[in-house]
Amino acid sequence: MAQQIELTNTVKDSQLGQRLDQAIAELFADFSRSRLKEWLLDGKVTVDGNVVTKPRTKVMGGEVITVLAELEDEVRWEAQDIPLDIVYEDDDILVINKPRDFVVHPGAGTPDGTVLNALLFHCPEVAEVPRAGIVHRLDKDTTGLMVVAKTVPAQTRLVRALQKRNITREYEAIAIGRMTAGGKVDKPIGRHATKRTLMAVSPMGKPAVTHFRVAEHFREHTRIRLRLETGRTHQIRVHMSYLQHPLLGDAAYGGRARIPAGASEDVTAMIRNFDRQALHAVMLRFEHPITGEEMEFHAPVPDDMVELTETLRRDAQEHGLPDEY
């Protein structure tokens, strides 16, 4: 069944001179460029109340853009009885704690067995919501908290809150190398020039900002806490790799095993055998899209990262930390 949707956002001053089709792609990032352009050409987009159908129209900043359209489901995904770790649920939203090895959305190579398929089984009503209510994603092997909308109004408002950076997402990670201080990475992220499944810091990419602080030192690794301002694909993994502190276990972005000198066999085995990026979405805070209530959720660090952390901590206690700490 087609869903009537209404999207509204304001053009940022930083978008001055952008083409309208480029501007709406940034403002309504939850929808594909091709779908947004189709709506634009069909007269479904207004700028300050006036219908505009020319993609090359320039924006100046400050305009209110509204999209009024019908959303047809492109594909009817299968509902599958896959367990979900539900942290919170009401009539409008669902918060889950995603385990490792769990893809969020069907795609090339993963036609089913995803979070989306599980959502369709658990709450069939999300079949009438774009993307089954998925507001943001976690990578396949990243664990932790995700919020899902169960209705179109809830999703529209959550997506808008995400675009306005009003949803707080914090992560815990183990980075390779000795990090002595926290900071901020403000570097745009785009598709990797040659490895098309990966992302990279790129001047042609989209704005991306990650804040981080040191939580605990180990001999050759650092436990860190991170907060996202933006939500680009692989953002934390790319930014930490850019800082030359890739996440332990993240082979795609340079997280090769680094063994501390004189490490025991147990420590060596733990580091070498940790086979996913050591990254967990530990905290999620946002305003409820319908009631306006401030909501905050926490997910305990999963067992594999707890064991990794305890192993690195014992190693540091046995051998002592480097003088630079």
Curated annotation (Swiss-Prot):
Entry's EC annotation: 5.4.99.23
Origin superkingdom: Bacteria
GO molecular function: 23S rRNA pseudouridine(1911/1915/1917) synthase activity; RNA binding
Keyword annotations: Cytoplasm, Isomerase, RNA-binding, rRNA processing
Domain S4 RNA-binding, chain residue ranges per copy: 18-91
Listed SUPFAM superfamilies: Alpha-L RNA-binding motif (SSF55174), Pseudouridine synthase (SSF55120)
Localization terms from the record: Cytoplasm
Active site: D139
Catalytic activity from the UniProt record: uridine(1911/1915/1917) in 23S rRNA = pseudouridine(1911/1915/1917) in 23S rRNA
Enzyme class (EC, first level): isomerase
Pfam families xref list: PseudoU_synth_2, S4
Entry's Gene Ontology BP terms: enzyme-directed rRNA pseudouridine synthesis
Keyword Cytoplasm (UniProt): yes
GO terms for cellular component: cytoplasm
SMART domains: S4 (SM00363)
Transferase is among the record's keywords: no
Chain's role: Responsible for synthesis of pseudouridine from uracil at positions 1911, 1915 and 1917 in 23S ribosomal RNA.
Database matches in PANTHER family: MITOCHONDRIAL RNA PSEUDOURIDINE SYNTHASE, RIBOSOMAL LARGE SUBUNIT PSEUDOURIDINE SYNTHASE D
UniProt family annotation: Belongs to the pseudouridine synthase RluA family.
The protein's name: Ribosomal large subunit pseudouridine synthase D
Organism in which the protein naturally occurs: Vibrio vulnificus (strain CMCP6)
